[in-house]
Structure formats: structure tokens, C-alpha cells
Amino acid sequence: KLLLPVEGRISHRFGNQRNQGKLRWHGIFINAAEGESVYAVHYGRVVFSDWLRGFGLLMIISHGEGYMSLYGHNQALFRETGDWVSAGEVIAAVGDSGGQDKTGLYFEIRIDGKPNNPQNWCVTREQRAA
């Protein structure tokens, strides 16, 4: 399995209700300290690196064959559209740019444009070591 992009407590899980039940989370929100490093979960090419309403400072990495990872609510983005990144490379810094009450990272995995539960794909460093 892949490593989660940041260490911290998952406060919102895939499929949980939000906005008084009108919407569901398409990813997970990981509480983490402002400025904490955000790591790419896999090798790929940055296809978006900018501010997007609802996501704040967002980076999207295409991993090929329809697989993408999304990293939102960042304080800073360290790679630009078109850049290639390696698994484990620092790509951003945790922030609160997406309008959440706490600092942290919003993280999604998409396959052919459809959100998938990141917890089916990723583990913490502690879980990997066990």
C-alpha cells in the first residue's frame, strides 16, 4: 500500500456526510499542523497546481492509466503544472486555505474521474512498519 501524504488524525472520512447531509466527502481530511510537509503518494505528473474554490491551494497529480491524487487546503504548493514528482517527494505545506476550521490536508484518490476511498489504498507509516 501507499503511504498517506501527511501524518495526522483523520477527522473526516470518505463518504461521511457534510453540509447538513446535502453532500458527502469524496476524500479524507487529515488534521495536521500548519506548515507540515505534504508528500506525493506515488510517481506522476502535476496536472493542476493553483487555488480552486472549495479546495483552497490544490495540487492534482496524474499517475497514468486514469489514476489521480488530489491534495487540498495547502498553505503553499512547491511544484507547478507539468512538473514530474516522485513518491515521497515534498510537494506542498499543510494549511487552511480551503475554509476548514482546523489546519490539515484534504486528500482524494480518483480512478477514471471517480472518487475512491483513500484508506483502501494508503496506510500510515506506523501501519506499514507493523
Sequence positions of predicted segments:
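Extracytoplasmic/periplasmic cell wall- or extracellular glycan-interacting regions that localize
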Residues: K1-F48, R53-F55, I60, R110, ...
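Residue-level recognition of beta-strand microenvironments
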Residues: R13, S49-D50, L77, V94-S97
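Gly/Ser/Thr-rich beta-alpha loop segments that engage phosphate groups in nucleotides
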Residues: Q17, L58, N74, V94-Q100
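Active-site proximal loops enriched in glycine and acidic residues that flank catalytic Cys/His/Asp
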Residues: H42, H63, H73-Q75, G95, ...
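Short histidine-centered loop motifs in beta-beta connectors
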Residues: S49, Y67-W84, G88
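Short beta-strand-turn/beta-hairpin segments enriched in glycine/proline and small hydrophobics
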Residues: L57-H73, K114
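Conserved, short, structured surface segments that act as functional micro-motifs
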Residues: T81-A130
